[in-house]
């Protein structure tokens, strides 16, 4: 997991060939004024989703993780909190991995929580199980999906 401010994104753009195109797009567009939906940057290799997510309490949050994609998440309208837990520490899955949706959900209670404000981002790699959308009200946010590259 990486947490940083948008101004520092150049430091990590070399970690994946699609990071640079995603961050260039984020920096040159007013995402908060865009309609909810998917924005293709490089087809299924890199795309954004603008979402209006209903905030939830920490005890209602559900851990998720992905195998094919890396998530870059950034709140646009207000602070958003996230739970995090290493994949190696997870307990029982709620259901088997959904190949089409690229997600697995877990029953573990959320314990470690951090909060981001607009202009800050988090990168969740496949080993980073996360519980997004912790907060109050409707949270406008951006979720970039970046195809994982095997080394």
Feature locations, PLM:
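Conserved metal-binding segment of the jelly-roll/cupin
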Residues: 114-129
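A short hydrophobic beta-strand segment most commonly corresponding to one strand
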Residues: 121-123, 137-151
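A short beta-loop-beta micro-motif enriched in histidine and acidic residues
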Residues: 43, 59-71, 89-93, 109-110
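Conserved short histidine dyad/triad with adjacent acidic residue
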Residues: 48-66, 76-90
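A short, N-terminal "cap"/entry segment at the start of jelly-roll beta-barrel domains
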Residues: 2-50, 57-65
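Short connector loops at helix/strand junctions that flank enzyme active sites
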Residues: 43-45, 65-69, 75-77, 98, ...
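Short, conserved beta-strand element in jelly-roll/cupin
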Residues: 68-80, 86-88, 95-102, 145-147
């Amino acid at each position: 997991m990486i947490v940083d401010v948008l101004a520092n994104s150049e430091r990590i753009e070399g970690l994946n060939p699609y990071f640079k195109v995603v961050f260039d797009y984020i920096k040159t567009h007013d995402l908060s004024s865009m309609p909810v939906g998917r924005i293709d940057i490089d087809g299924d290799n890199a795309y954004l989703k603008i979402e209006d997510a209903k905030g939830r309490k920490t005890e209602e949050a559900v851990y998720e993780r992905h195998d094919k994609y890396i998530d870059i998440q950034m709140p646009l309208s207000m602070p958003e909190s996230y739970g995090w837990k290493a994949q190696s520490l997870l307990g029982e899955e709620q259901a088997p991995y959904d190949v089409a949706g690229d997600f697995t959900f877990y029953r573990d209670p959320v314990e470690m929580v951090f909060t981001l404000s607009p202009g800050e981002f988090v990168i969740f790699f496949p080993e980073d199980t996360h519980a997004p959308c912790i907060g109050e009200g409707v949270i406008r946010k951006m979720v970039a999906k970046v195809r994982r590259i095997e080394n």
